[in-house]
A protein has these predicted regions:
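N-terminal leader/presequence regions that precede the main folded/catalytic core
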Residues: 1-80
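Short beta-strand-to-loop capping motifs
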Residues: 28-33, 102-104, 139-141, 181
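Short, hydrophobic/proline-enriched secondary-structure or compact coil segments at domain edges
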Residues: 20-29, 92-102, 210-218
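A cross-kingdom marker for long, charged
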Residues: 185-221
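Extended intrinsically disordered, low-complexity coil regions enriched in Ser, Thr, Gly, Ala
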Residues: 33-58, 109-114, 145-169, 207, ...
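Intrinsically disordered, low-complexity segments enriched in Gly and acidic/Ser/Thr residues
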Residues: 140-194, 199
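Short, flexible beta-strand-to-coil junctions
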Residues: 30-32, 75, 88, 101-105, ...
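Extracytoplasmic beta-rich ectodomain segments of secreted or membrane-anchored proteins
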Residues: 59-149
Length: 221
C-alpha cells in the first residue's frame, strides 16, 4: 500500500503487533554558547512550535562551561516528547545542540503522515545538513524467539524493504540483523557498505517475552 511508511510495511510482514513508535533526533542549532536563561527561553519557544502541553517544568542550569535545559510534554495525538538543550563553550568551540525524543504507544491511522509531519517539524529547528532522525518500531513476542524464527522474520522484513542483509549476530539473549535499503536512505547519506535498517530481539527471561525492535538510524524518504 503506497500510503504506508516502508518500516510499517516491513513490520506488518512480521505478523507481530506494533506497540510503540519512537523517534530520536539530535542536531546542532548554532555556533554560540547560550546561558541557562537563554536556553530556557528557547525551550519555551520550542514548546509552542511543537504544540505541547507540558508535563514537567523546564529544568535548566549551568555547570561550568556547560548549560542545559530540558522538559517533557504531550501532544493531542498522545505523542510524549522530551526536549533537551545543551550549550557548551571552550577555547576552540562554542556550540548549542538540541535533542528531541518522541514516543507514541497508541494506534496511528497513517504512520507515514505522522512520521513525515514529525520530521518536518523537528528538522525545521535547525539549518544543519547533518540532522539525524532515527525511527524505532517496537513490539513483543511471547516466549523466546529462536534463531530460525529470527531469520524468518528478518527475511520477511528485509524483503519488504528491498534490503540487502549485511550482518547477522546471534547471542544468548539477543540477536541483531542489519541491512541496507534504498527505500530508507536519503541521497548521499549512506554508503552501500553501511546499514540503515536494524532488527534487534532481546529475551526477557523474567517475563518470558522477546522484545522486538526495528530501527532505521538515519533519514527517511
Amino acid at each position: 500500500r503506497i500510503y504506508e511508511h516502508p518500516l510499517e510495511t516491513a513490520w506488518e510482514a512480521s505478523g507481530l503487533k506494533l506497540q510503540s513508535i519512537t523517534t530520536e533526533s539530535w542536531m546542532k542549532l548554532n555556533d554560540r554558547w547560550l546561558t541557562a536563561y537563554e536556553l530556557k527561553e528557547l525551550a519555551n519557544n520550542i514548546k509552542e512550535k511543537l504544540d505541547l502541553k507540558t508535563t514537567t517544568e523546564v529544568i535548566s542550569g549551568d555547570q561550568g562551561e556547560l548549560s542545559y535545559a530540558s522538559f517533557e510534554g504531550i501532544q493531542d495525538d498522545k505523542t510524549v516528547i522530551t526536549v533537551t538543550l545543551q550549550s557548551s563553550r571552550s577555547d576552540y568551540l562554542n556550540e548549542t545542540q538540541l535533542g528531541i525524543h518522541t514516543v507514541n504507544n497508541s494506534k496511528l491511522k497513517n504512520l507515514r503522515q505522522y512520521l513525515n509531519g514529525l520530521k518536518k517539524t523537528i528538522t525545521g529547528f535547525s539549518n544543519s545538513l547533518s540532522i539525524n532522525f532515527a525511527i524505532i518500531l517496537a513490539g513483543e513476542y511471547h516466549g523466546k524467539m529462536g534463531r530460525s524464527l529470527v531469520k524468518e522474520i528478518s527475511g520477511k522484513m528485509f524483503r519488504k524493504l528491498e534490503a540487502e542483509q549485511v550482518d547477522l549476530i546471534f547471542e544468548n539473549e539477543g540477536n541483531i540483523a542489519r541491512g541496507y535499503s534504498t527505500l530508507l536512505s536519503e541521497p548521499n547519506t549512506l554508503q552501500k557498505s553501511a546499514f540503515n535498517i536494524e532488527l534487534t530481539t532481546i529475551y526477557d527471561q523474567s517475563r518470558n517475552i522477546t522484545e522486538v525492535v526495528l530501527a532505521s538510524p538515519g533519514g527517511n524518504k
